[in-house]
Amino acid sequence: MPVITLPDGSQREFDKPVSIMEVAADIGAGLAKATVAGRIDGELVDACELIEHDARIEIVTPKDDDGVHIIRHSCAHLMGHAVKQMWPDAKMAIGPVIDNGFYYDIDVDHTFTQEDLEKIEKRMKELAKTEYAVVKKKASWKEARETFVERHEPYKIEILDEDIPTDATPGLYHHEEYIDMCRGPHVPNMKFCQHFKIMKMAGAYWRGDSDNKMLQRIYGTAWADKKQLKAYLQRLEEAEKRDHRKIAKAQDLFHWQEEAPGMVFWHHNGWTIFRELETYIREKMREYEYQEVKGPMMMDRVLWEKSGHWEKFSELMFTTSSENREYAVKPMNCPGHVQIFNQGLKSYRDLPLRMAEFGSCHRNEPSGALHGLMRVRGFTQDDAHIFCTEQQVQEEVAGCIKMVYETYKTFGFENIDVKLSTRPEKRLGDDATWDRSETALAQALKNNDIDFSYLPGEGAFYGPKIEFTLFDCLGRAWQCGTIQLDFALPGRLGATYVGEDNERHTPVMIHRAILGSLERFMGILIEEYAGHFPLWLSPTQVVLMNITDNQSDYVRKVVKTLNEKGIRASADLRNEKIGFKIREHTLKRVPYLLVVGDKEVEAGEVAVRTRGGEDLGKFPLEDFITRVEDEVRTRKID
C-alpha cells in the first residue's frame, strides 16, 4: 500500500496503487481541478501516472513553470490535431517547446499563408473549447510503429527506427481522433490550453540537415492565463519597436548587404558607439592590469589541428589556400595568445600573465541563423586569456567576476543569472583534470557569494565555464560573458613556465570575455536603450540650433568649442522653424538640444533642452560644458 509524502512533509496512505490526479483529488477538489501533472520522487510525470510504492510527490499546476511548459507542449499537439483535420495528408514531424512557446514542423504539399495560420488558430480554439480529455496510452515499440505506418506518418516512423530502442514503451497521446507520440507529460484535458496565439511560420530542414527535405515550421506561444498572454504580446510589440535593425536604419548606424552576409558595414554613427565600447573596455583592462595584444587573422591549419579546434570546429571555419598550405581564418583568439606566451622563457614570477585582444573573428554560421547584430559571421571579441598556476586560479577568477559585474553595472544591467557549465560528451583532457577545473570554478563563485546553478554537459570542449546572462528591460535573457578554465590547450600548444623548483610546468589558462561579441552587445544596448543612448555613447551628444541667421556665427563658434573639448556636437543652421528642428532631433534621440537666439548670443549662453522634452533653462557655455564632461566621465545612465 503506497504511502505518499507531500512537499510539506505530511503523508497520506492508500490501499491500492493511486494516480497523481487521485492524490490531488484526495487533498481537495480544487487542487484536482488545477492539476496539470506531477512529480514522483522528482521525476515529472503525467497526471494519470500510477504510484505503486512509497514516494514523495508534488502536484504541478499552471502556476508552476513546469505547468506552463507542459501547456505549451500540449498546444503543439493541439496544433497537430488542427492541421491534420484541415490537411489530412499533412505529415507531422516534431513539435517541441521553445522559449515562450512551441512549434511544429510539418510536411505538406500546400504552402501555408498568413490566412492559413489564422484558420489554424481558429480551429485550435474550437477544439480547445470542447475541453476534450487527453488520453495517454503506453504502447510497445512495435505497436507504436504499426500505428504510424497505418496513419502514413513517415517522420514518426523514422524517429522510432533511429532514436527509440525497440524495448521501449513509447507514450501515445490520443487527442480524440489524432494521435501523437511523445515522452510527455501532457495536460490531462484541453481546458488548460485556452490561452495561445499562432505567431509566424518559417522553413526548417528535417533534423536541421540541409540535405533533408525543407519542412514548414509554424510557431506559437501559450500561457497559463489570458493576462500572461496579453502581457507577452505587449512585450513583443515593444520589442518590435526596439528592434536594433530598425533603429540602426533610423539613426544611420550600420547596414547589411547580400555581398557580405553576416558582416557589418559600420557607418560613422555606429562606429562611434563601437569605439566608445572599446575605449571603456580598454580602461577596465588597464585597471585590472591586462596587456593588450593583436594576433594574426589567419593561421596554418596545422596549428588549428594541434590546438584541437580543427577536429571540433572545422565546419564553422573559413579556409583558404596559398602556396600549397591551408589556412583558417580564426574563429577565436586563444591559440594565437598561446603563441605570444610561448615567445621567450617564462618564470613563475611572470604569472599571472593577463593577455587581452579585441580579436576580429569569423565563423561560418548557417545563413538561416544570421540575425542582425545578434548572430553574425564577422565579429569582435573582447577576449582575454590569463596564464597562471593552479594555486592562482581562484584569485584570478574572482578578479574576472568582479570585472564582469562592474562592467554590466556601467550599462545598467544588474539582474544577472550565473550558470556553471560542466564537461560535455566530446572533450579534451581526462576526468581528473575536469574534476579539478569544475571544482575550482565552483569554489571561486561560492567564495564571492555568487548564486549559481549548473548546466551539465554544456562546457566548452577544453574546460568548464561560467556563463553570465543579462536580463534586459523586457525580461529577455542575453548570455554574454564567460569565464572558462582550460587545463588542456596550453599543454597541447607547448606552453610552459619554470616553477620555483626549476622544473618546467604547464600553466593553467583562463579564457575570459565580458561583452562577448561587441557587435552582439551593441545590438543588445540598442534595444535596451531603444536608441536613447546614454550621453557617453551617443554618436551626436549635442546639437545646436539657431532661431535666425543672426546666430549662425555664434552657433559655429560654440560647436567648434565643444568639439575641441571632446564633446561630439553638430549645428543645424537650416532655415526651418525652431519647433521643427527640435522635433526632428528629438526623434534622432540626440541627448542635448541647444537653442540659440539673440539673447543667448548677447549673454554668451545656450538654452538647453533634453531629448525627453525637459527644459533645463539657460546655461553659461562653460557651465554646460562642465555638466556634459561630468556626465560623460561618470558614464551616467539616463
From Swiss-Prot:
Cofactor binding notes: Binds 1 zinc ion per subunit.
Signal peptide: none
Main location: cytoplasm
Start and end residues of each stretch annotated as Catalytic: 243-534
Coiled-coil intervals: none
Its EC number(s): 6.1.1.3
Residues where Zn(2+) binds: 334, 385, 511
GO molecular function: ATP binding; metal ion binding; threonine-tRNA ligase activity; tRNA binding
Reactions the enzyme catalyzes: tRNA(Thr) + L-threonine + ATP = L-threonyl-tRNA(Thr) + AMP + diphosphate + H(+)
Gene Ontology terms: biological process: threonyl-tRNA aminoacylation
Entry keyword Chloroplast: no
Domain (TGS) ranges: 1-61
InterPro entries, sorted: aa-tRNA-synt_IIb (IPR002314), aa-tRNA-synth_II (IPR006195), aa-tRNA-synth_II/BPL/LPL (IPR045864), Anticodon-bd (IPR004154), Anticodon-bd_dom_sf (IPR036621), Beta-grasp_dom_sf (IPR012675), TGS (IPR004095), TGS-like (IPR012676)
EC class (word): ligase
Keywords attached to this entry: Aminoacyl-tRNA synthetase, ATP-binding, Cytoplasm, Ligase, Metal-binding, Nucleotide-binding, Protein biosynthesis, RNA-binding, tRNA-binding, Zinc
Obligatory cofactor(s): Zn(2+)
Gene Ontology CC: cytosol
Subcellular location: Cytoplasm
Alphabetized PANTHER family for the sequence: THREONINE--TRNA LIGASE, CHLOROPLASTIC_MITOCHONDRIAL 2, THREONINE-TRNA LIGASE
Subunit architecture: Homodimer.
Function: Catalyzes the attachment of threonine to tRNA(Thr) in a two-step reaction: L-threonine is first activated by ATP to form Thr-AMP and then transferred to the acceptor end of tRNA(Thr). Also edits incorrectly charged L-seryl-tRNA(Thr).
HAMAP family for this protein: Thr_tRNA_synth
Homology family: Belongs to the class-II aminoacyl-tRNA synthetase family.
Protein name per the record: Threonine--tRNA ligase
